[in-house]
Amino acid sequence: MTDYYDVNLKNARQKLLCENLNFYNYRGLVQDTKLLNEIYSLHKPNIVIHLAAQAGVRYSIENPISYVESNLIGTFHILEMARKYKPDHLLMASTSSVYGSNKDMPLHETQKCDTQLSFYAATKKSNEAMAHSYSHLYDIP
């Protein structure tokens, strides 16, 4: 869990989620395929919510490799797990940063978003493209 956003708030939310008997929490890296395979084979989830990411526009300028590892490679592994274990649904978070220099407000999903202004936004837009292609190629809802 990164400290880019308030860790106390994250822990409080996680505590609430853990009260649900159908919620399983693991700490690790989304790049850890051994851990991901253990989790998927043990629980066989029917819904996967992928929120893991290295966040932050400014930090992506200083440390772009962490965005490659977490956002690109990590998301690739989540998509591969979905291809292998076939959950009923895979939900992924993106960011408004993908809209880049778009001036039309309010933002909406049908707007063009091909002008990312940060490496963070570029990795998240890449995640969207990867997820779209996996959904099409491997019938992942």
Model-derived regions, located:
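N-terminal Rossmann-like NAD(P)+-binding domain of SDR-like oxidoreductases, especially those catalyzing
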Residues: 1-141
